[in-house]
């Protein structure tokens, strides 16, 4: 998407290894993971206090697995800027190092999915058996209602997957067969 679109909402990912090492894996900044984590927290708090961002939620992922071990610590964020900005401006403000690490989240569906991904409670993350992070690991400022955001829109809430339909159909079939459920009762369960 061209950089002429302005929006308030963005998702951001920052990575410890990428911010402290060059492409050849040589150390460029000699700080520990804990120091980096505190630096990111202070940076975001400062942006919030300065009024440049209205609200945000972030979480540090340090338990994500690769085939070779654990993925380097990284942070995921959902940020509402105080004023609409182009992606390049948001990237510069939020410390994104790559176009891939800062993305638009102006649609409610994008925010719902991104907020669920913070904890790894998206269907895709759970199917991939990713570590589920606890809500107590979230860092939130500005009163962002993460539960409301996770729910998304009414349309999204009513969308169910094919496997969920299969499970429901099987359950209703068994109840009709075993308990003599009527068509009317089955419809009530469906709707």
Each predicted region: which residue ranges?
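Short secondary-structure boundary/capping segments within folded domains
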Residues: 2, 47-48, 65-69
């Amino acid at each position: 998407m061209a950089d002429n679109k302005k929006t308030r909402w963005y998702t951001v990912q920052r990575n410890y290894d990428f911010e402290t090492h060059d492409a050849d894996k040589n150390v460029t900044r000699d700080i520990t993971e804990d120091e980096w984590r505190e630096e990111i927290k202070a940076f975001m708090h400062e942006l919030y206090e300065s009024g440049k961002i209205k609200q945000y939620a972030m979480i540090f992922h340090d338990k994500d697995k690769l085939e070779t071990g654990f993925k380097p610590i990284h942070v995921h964020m959902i940020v509402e800027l105080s004023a609409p900005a182009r992606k390049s401006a948001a990237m510069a403000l939020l410390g994104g190092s790559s176009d891939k690490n800062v993305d638009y989240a102006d649609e409610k569906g994008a925010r719902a999915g991104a907020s669920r991904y913070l904890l790894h409670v998206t269907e895709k993350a759970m199917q991939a058996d990713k570590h589920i992070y606890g809500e107590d690991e979230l860092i939130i400022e500005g009163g962002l209602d993460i539960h409301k955001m996770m729910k998304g829109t009414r349309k999204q809430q009513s969308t169910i997957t094919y496997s969920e339909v299969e499970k429901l159909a099987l359950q209703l079939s068994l109840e009709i067969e075993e308990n003599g459920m009527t068509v009317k009762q089955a419809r009530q369960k469906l709707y």
